[in-house]
Amino acid sequence: MGQKTHPYGFRLGITKDWKSHWYAERSDYSSLLHEDWAIRNYIKKNYYQAGISLIEIERKAANRVDITIHTARPGMLIGRGGSEIENIRKNLVKLTNKSVFVNVQEVKNPELDAQLVAENIATQIEKRINYKRAMKQAINRALRAGAKGVKVMCSGRLNGAEIARSEWFREGRIPLQTLTADIDYGFAEAFTISGVIGVKVWIYKGDVPELHKEPIQELPEKAVPKKIEDEDLYEKDEVNYDVDA
């Protein structure tokens, strides 16, 4: 049975970039990785309603952490006069014991962000809205926003069924095996009375223009040995015979 590879990891280093930018020695790698997880978990858990799509972490020095939060509602993170963003920074300083700088960037088009679409569908399911209606509405909004293809899948005890199953809807193209395809992927969970329902969203936005590549210089053609005939092995001496009359 075929399985779907993660669209982000499949294109990592080709059309997608890393979410964490830092380098560490082997002895420090695990602690910094756990620190990244703790930072993302704190922000996502305490500000879930802010519509956070992506959290980028960069370490330019040993005691400095730069965090960029991509959100659909920057006002909820910044607060009145920047009070909320300062509160986030202070809590992260206590969590990491390092200097923390927080930057907030607004997501211009939330309908084309797969993570935000998945979280929106999960929230509607938790509010007892029919999952089919939530999925179809999300697909229509994404297509109107300019998406070339959308696929949404819900898995779990849908509508409280005794047996878990998966249902999905798709509109347009989703070329999962094309490395130059700009496919955004998001995953969210809806916690209901009957259990957890997983929501996956794929959004195809078009092809990414190929990166600039230097023209490959053509190698000189390989010399092909010429076939030597037997007649060429021995040169024939030309002899002139003078015949006296």
Swiss-Prot record:
Domain annotation KH type-2: ranges: 39-108
Gene3D superfamilies reported in the protein's UniProt record: 3.30.300.20, Ribosomal protein S3, C-terminal domain
Gene Ontology CC: cytosolic small ribosomal subunit
InterPro entries to which the protein is assigned, alphabetical: KH_dom (IPR004087), KH_dom-like_a/b (IPR015946), KH_dom_type_2 (IPR004044), KH_sf_prok-type (IPR009019), Ribosomal_S3_C_sf (IPR036419), Ribosomal_uS3_bac-typ (IPR005704), Ribosomal_uS3_C (IPR001351), Ribosomal_uS3_CS (IPR018280)
Pfam families: KH_2, Ribosomal_S3_C
GO MF terms, alphabetically ordered: mRNA binding; rRNA binding; structural constituent of ribosome
Keywords: Ribonucleoprotein, Ribosomal protein, RNA-binding, rRNA-binding
GO BP annotations, alphabetical order: translation
NCBIfam families xref list: rpsC_bact (TIGR01009)
Subunit field text: Part of the 30S ribosomal subunit. Forms a tight complex with proteins S10 and S14.
Function: Binds the lower part of the 30S subunit head. Binds mRNA in the 70S ribosome, positioning it for translation.
Protein family membership: Belongs to the universal ribosomal protein uS3 family.
Protein name: Small ribosomal subunit protein uS3
Organism this protein belongs to: Dictyoglomus turgidum (strain DSM 6724 / Z-1310)
